Amino acid sequence: MCDDDVAALVIDNGSGMVKAGFAGDDAPRAVFPSIVGRPRHQGVMVGMGQKDSYVGDEAQSKRGILTLKYPMEHGIVTNWDDMEKIWHHTFYNELRVAPEEHPVLLTEAPLNPKANREKMTQIMFETFNSPAMYVAIQAVLSLYASGRTTGIVFDSGDGVSHTVPIYEGYALPHAILRLDLAGRDLTDYLMKILTERGYSFTTTAEREIVRDIKEKLCYVALDFEQEMQTAASSSSLEKSYELPDGQVITIGNERFRCPEALFQPAFLGMESAGIHETCYNSIMKCDVDIRKDLYANTVLSGGSTMFPGIADRMQKEITALAPPTMKIKIIAPPERKYSVCIGGSILASLSTFQQMWISKQEYDESGPSIVHRKCF
């Protein structure tokens, strides 16, 4: 299929961040926000080389004058032109490779619309002339990265969360559950509850500030009610944060109220089960014989599982739902932010995987629908 000296590319294009690298790497080479920014003001200085759009970190650094848009929402691409810009930026500016020379492994959330992966396939072959490509399910790659073949992965990124039970390397599609509640919803919720405190964040650029507050200061309480009482009676939980203009804001119970929405989606007005219940429901959809192995191998993955305290809280909540004697183990690897990308790197460098690629030739014969036959 392809020579050994040509490394495959692994691109984990998430709703919030793109993680990209080469097969065989133990960490992504490029990590940048999946953002396309367009100027919201008229350019007046000649010779500045102003562009009509900026991608990734450059958009982030000029956010004060740009309108920032994420081309992916809830794991589904909503703007293909912008997505193409992001891929172009990934290949040419971040990884500095010619896409027509390397096979590329892309990732996607389970239970995504079929049209989404077809279009991904089409763009890779027709716009970038990839020699071969493959679309893998994110959670499955996370399990590879944790060195297991059996377990249930709870993967939560910026756009979508899902639980995928995997037994001896087989994903169990009937038991996969998807929850459209993830990092971006938490950021929006934090924006809302900070407004109640008298701090107003409204623009797309200010949302990025709130995301930073969330990532630096939020944590999951082991006992939410008790934590609320502690916060009300003392200022021990308060932390201050300096905004880019030097103004300092104080945040208290918002620190744990924000990620609490993962366990109580009703906070966001969502009528769905929390992440602990979703995990439990997913396990209960599996065969009774394998549940024990799933309970003992619950793997967390993705950026929205990076909150301190989330593993202990998951342990507590799932223990309360599961049968009393069941051994429950939550695995939260420190590199779980990038475990999808790392898993992709492992998968793409396996010798047994080389016959799994969709080649340009197969694509030319069958069209975009080949992706459903070749990729799980």
UniProtKB/Swiss-Prot annotation:
Annotated GO MF terms: ATP binding; hydrolase activity
Keywords, ordered alphabetically: Acetylation, ATP-binding, Cytoplasm, Cytoskeleton, Hydrolase, Nucleotide-binding
Broad EC category: hydrolase
Propeptide: 1-2
TM region(s), chain numbering: none
Main location per the UniProt record: cytoplasm
Cell location: Cytoplasm; Cytoplasm, Cytoskeleton
KW Protein transport (keyword) present: no
Modified residues (N-acetylaspartate): 3
A Pfam family annotated for this UniProt entry: Actin
Keyword Nucleotide-binding: yes
Reactions catalysed according to its record: ATP + H2O = ADP + phosphate + H(+)
GO cellular component, one term: cytoskeleton
EC number: 3.6.4.-
Function: Actins are highly conserved proteins that are involved in various types of cell motility and are ubiquitously expressed in all eukaryotic cells.
Entry similarity comment: Belongs to the actin family.
PANTHER family, sorted: ACTIN
Official protein name in the record: Actin, cytoskeletal 1B
